[in-house]
Amino acid sequence: VVHDRLNVEIFRGCTRGCRFCQAGMVTRPVRERPREQIVSMVEKGLKRTGYDEVSLTSLSSADFSGIENVISEVMTQDSCSPVSLSLPSLRVDAFTVDTASQMQQARRTGLTFAPEAGTWRLRQVINKLISDDDLFAAVESAYSQGWRRVKLYFLIGLPTETDEDTLGIVDLAEKTLEIGRKYHKSPSVTVSVGGFVPKPGTPFQWFGQNTEQELLRKIYLLRDAAKKIRGLKLKWHDSRATVVEGILSRGDRRLAPVLEKVWKEGGVFQEWSEHFDIDLWKNAMEEEELLIEDFSYRHRDENEVLPWDHLSAGLHKDFLWQDWRDALNNLGLEDCRWTPCYDCGACTGYGIEHVVASAVPPAGGSQGTGAVSQQGNEITVSISQTGTAKDLQVSGVNE
């Protein structure tokens, strides 16, 4: 009912390396669908469903190699007129003038960009290597092509975050509105803020989550700064729900009776705000003699055995730890689709590799612009003689 549109998945996986993103870490490598197959799926899907909106889905749709060609071919199909086209999960450094120009042929919907953090320094920490200028160029492309509504998504409670980083969210939104006013009388910007919850299998799995009170303080800081700006709307996620999400995110088997107690006390549809009751969770934790601090708020050290260590999505734990240390030093890693392998384990551990529809990177770069870590990965290569030396070719040995 919510997603009342045709959804076509254009690729799986993501190698941008955002350190907060579990999906981007555990679904590596990138596997792109052939362009011709995507166009065919859209055409057939529209004919069979009667939908008038198409969403080209992935973890970062504008990163699809040759995305402008895909949009162009989709929009020239007879079955796609008049149809609205959306690209969810847009990275601002991959949204170009060409992309905006192609999309403006369709019926316009709002555009959502995810800078995630309010300052360049903090975006280096989380490896979301997009500059302020990247954001401003993207929104200028959108506003100049006729869009009036832009939504920006951010996280608060990220590692090393300061009040300056938090207030940078409002500063970016205000400058985005200024760009919009160059093209429209009443542009609008909606800022959506969520509390950061560390996830297993990511470099931030060792980080101690912000408390409910600290998240609330940052929300009030944003609210007070945003209320005087015309055209800016601020939304935020319930910090109490973020507490429960943190418990469940890095919990272990001891939470099984907690879940059962919450359910027995009527805790159903807890993801719905009108049904959510944090007291059910706090009471159940107390009855089981468990502390929220132990699950959510404390930092872990390198040698701690984590509840999910026996599970593997391919990434080496030592790679994640080094990436965590790089984060604390504001060091970024570029997209490994277009750079040498970092030996994270996702590909080398399974003998697989990236599958891209085009050998040319997206026009937006997809390369990253941050300070790149000089930390390499040591690989030991063993060579042994298993046959008669006379059978070896000189060229083979040299290679």
Model-predicted segments: where are they?
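Active-site-adjacent "gating/activation" loops or surface patches in catalytic cores
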Residues: 1-19, 101-113, 121
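Flexible glycine/acidic-rich beta-alpha junction loops that bind and position SAM and/or redox cofactors
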Residues: 16, 65-66, 95-99, 121-126, ...
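Conserved, mostly hydrophobic/aromatic
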Residues: 14, 18, 38, 87, ...
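Two-metal-ion acidic nuclease core segments, chiefly of the RNase H-like superfamily
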Residues: 216-226
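Glycine- and acidic
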Residues: 3-8, 19-29, 51-59, 118-125, ...
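Radical SAM enzyme core and accessory elements
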Residues: 228-399
